[in-house]
Amino acid sequence: KNVPIVVISGKHLHPDHIHAPNVVISLISMHNTFRAILAMTTFLVTGALSSCNHTDELEPESPAPQIVFLFSPGGLGDMSYNDRILEGVQRFKMENGDIDIYIYSPESLQEAEKIFADWLERPQSSIPVLFVLGSSDYEPMAELYLAEHDLTPNKSILLFESRKQYKDENIHTFQISMFGASYLAGVCARKCSEMTPLVLLANNTDSPINIAKDGFIAGYGSDCDVEYLADDWTGYVSASLAYRKMSDWAVDYDFIFPVAGGSNAGIYRYSREFEVSPYLAGMDIDQSSLSNRITGSVIKHIDQLIYRYLTEWVVTGDMPENQLYGLESGYADWLVAPRYVNDFSSLVNGMRPQAKIFEKEYYETSGY
């Protein structure tokens, strides 16, 4: 029997509370409902189609494995990292219709913490369950609660964008390094920028984006100005603040490297509306179509990676314990925008081997 995808947004519900196995449940209570619906529409349709069956079909002898997915607060609908994750989960679901998938899209870090804590308290069962923490924002939360709770044998955890290695073999982590790709972005900025670039970060506590900052500065070859939109996860949902500040930044800088989330509604929007705008970099996916000032994009093939991890878990019951994926892996890269190919392609191709070397050296010496 095929089962649905359940999207749970803004509600403290658990899979066991739902007793309608052939119904797709969508509880939308996010701040940006329209964008969330756009992000989930294809996913929901897929789940609805896959859940059709005949009334006389027998129930399976054993319960289906479950995957519980906790997206970053306000992340779905970003047309970037989170939506790309969703695409990977959707692909997995289309090929594994017998797996229950429950998606939580919390409105705050506090809500996410409640969902995770409640799940950890659930008793052991015969159903294999994988809980996916789909954001580096959740690393402090995971460390706190996993120090106090042991996983029952049926539970596994996958934590995104973390370098921490846990003693429990059922806790798995990975990080897609942005150092090498950001290094190549910095190389391009050096060629087209006549002023000190601005590195704009969501916050100063998230190690993956600080790694991107270090890579960009290394590629640029000298110091850059650095600004933070917030001191916590809310920096990822501060597009309106970035938009307001762009009027000043457009005067002071001719290249901005934004690792802040929601840039399409902030920085890229400004560059579309005003003729005078700095050169920019896209983030996580190819965003060159969003602004003619985007010179290239730091690419994360997170959709391919999450598909691989989920498939491996279903087939083998296990996943790699702790992995780092950089330029060498193919899961990260710097993709030059089509309109700037003649300006940067040869330069980037020539510097890519050096970027791989510097990325490896960075992790050997930085402590990350």
Question: How should these model regions be labeled?
Answer:
Residues A48-S51:
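C-terminal motif of bacterial Sec signal peptides marking the signal peptidase cleavage site
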Residues N53-T55:
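Bacterial signal peptide processing site
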Residues I67-G88, F92, I103-L109, P208-I209:
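Extracytoplasmic "Venus flytrap"
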Residues F69, S125-S136, F160, V251-G262, ...:
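Periplasmic-binding protein-like
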Residues V89, A181-D223, P320-D343:
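An alpha-beta-alpha
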Residues T152-T173, I285-R293:
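Flexible loop/hinge segments that line or gate small-molecule binding clefts
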Residues F174-T196, V298-D318:
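Hydrophobic alpha-helical segments within soluble ligand-binding/sensing domains
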Residues E312-Y368:
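Hinge/cleft segment of the Venus flytrap/periplasmic-binding protein
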